[in-house]
A protein has these predicted regions:
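Short beta-strand-centered segments that line the small-molecule binding cleft or hinge
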Residues: 2, 87, 110-114, 132-169, ...
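A late-sequence structural motif
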Residues: 107, 257-306, 313
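A short LG(V/I)-centered, amphipathic sequence patch enriched
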Residues: 16, 42-61
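Short helix-boundary/capping micro-motifs
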Residues: 12-33
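Hydrophobic hinge/microswitch elements
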Residues: 130-135, 139-142, 149, 201-259, ...
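Secondary-structure junction motif
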Residues: 149, 179-180, 193-215, 244-245, ...
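Beta-alpha-beta core module
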Residues: 156-162, 167, 227-281
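Central regulatory/effector-binding core of bacterial HTH transcription factors
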Residues: 92-153, 223
Length: 315
């Protein structure tokens, strides 16, 4: 059986696009050349890899097995080439990692800015998503690491977690909001207004259940983009959340007001972030990945990153 990496890349594109036309475009090939490549791969393995009788061209059982191995092989080959280039002093490899929405709106872009200043020839690809999807893509070897909530990975020996500093988050509203001038408010008063947040972080879900007394509590507006959520808060009576790591609050320019809630103690663990860097224990990080992680951790430890907090905002 003879299989080359180019054919595997083509099959991955077909599996992702579910179309010979779109798959060919994704790898910059003519449709006829792309089809011949898939057919040659099927001839090498001795069986069909996609069900051509289905409109979505779903992989056959053999195709699913090949796809799983193909992704690992292609990812491993890319990582090998990157590491060799980096060790040769070219510093021109590619880095692929993921990030949760909150770190992606401040901490991580700042770290990338420092990183590309030191490695101007490097190519950085980072994907913003929730921790569940980031975990899946890490397992599929699309990423070397990701930055997100670490609670679900700290006790798993398959992962290495490097914790970042815990940061306090708060409920907040626009400066002209009816609750803006209050020293503190009750949970009932807070929840009488629309809530615009993401509820994926487990600590936030815990607080919302605590305040509402409902396991199925759902916000009025749910989104993974901190900038979009804050636009909703600044243009309505909706309540949002705010805290460190994000540059959203710098752009608010004093228009955000922090809300103290009677039922929430300041030392409550759920009111603090638990972000960190998650990687696979069985996979060695490339030099560029290690360098990026160093920049993220250094920025997290530095005093200048604290400008992302709420100290300069109305309280």
């Amino acid at each position: 059986m003879h299989i080359d990496l180019r054919q595997l890349r083509h099959f991955i594109a077909l599996a992702e696009q579910r179309s010979f036309v779109a798959g060919a475009q994704a790898v910059n090939l003519s449709q006829s050349a792309f089809s011949r490549s898939i057919q040659a791969l099927e001839h090498s393995v001795g069986c069909p890899l996609v069900d051509r009788g289905r409109k979505d061209l779903a992989p056959t059982k053999q195709g699913q097995v090949l796809l799983e191995h193909a992704r690992r092989l292609v990812s491993g080959a890319r990582q090998m080439a990157n590491e060799i280039n980096q060790f040769n002093g070219l510093e021109a490899g590619e880095l692929h990692f993921g990030c949760g929405p909150a770190p992606a709106s401040g901490l991580v872009p700042r770290a990338i800015g420092r990183f590309i200043g030191r490695y101007p020839k490097a190519r950085v690809h980072f994907q913003v998503d929730d921790w569940q999807r980031l975990s899946k893509r890490l397992q599929d070897e699309e990423f070397e690491f990701f930055v997100a909530d670490t609670r679900n990975f700290e006790a798993d020996p398959a992962y290495i977690t490097q914790r970042l500093r815990p940061r306090r988050w708060h409920f907040c509203c626009r400066a002209g909001h009816p609750l803006a001038g209050r020293h503190s408010v009750s949970a009932a008063e807070l929840l009488s207004y629309p809530l615009a947040v993401t509820i994926r972080p487990p600590n936030l879900r815990k607080v919302l259940v605590q305040l509402s007394g409902r396991l199925d509590y759902a916000p009025n507006v749910e989104c993974e983009s901190p900038f979009s959520l804050m636009s909703v808060v600044l243009s309505s009576d909706a309540i949002g959340i705010c805290g460190a790591y994000s540059d959203v609050f710098l752009y608010a320019k004093g228009d955000l007001v922090r809300i103290a809630v009677d039922e929430l103690a300041d030392d409550q663990d759920a009111l603090y972030t638990r972000y960190g860097i998650v990687s696979r224990a069985a996979v060695r990080l490339s030099p560029l990945a290690q360098a990026m992680i160093e920049q993220i951790k250094a920025l997290d430890d530095s005093d200048d990153h604290d400008v992302c907090g709420l100290e300069n905002f109305a309280i």
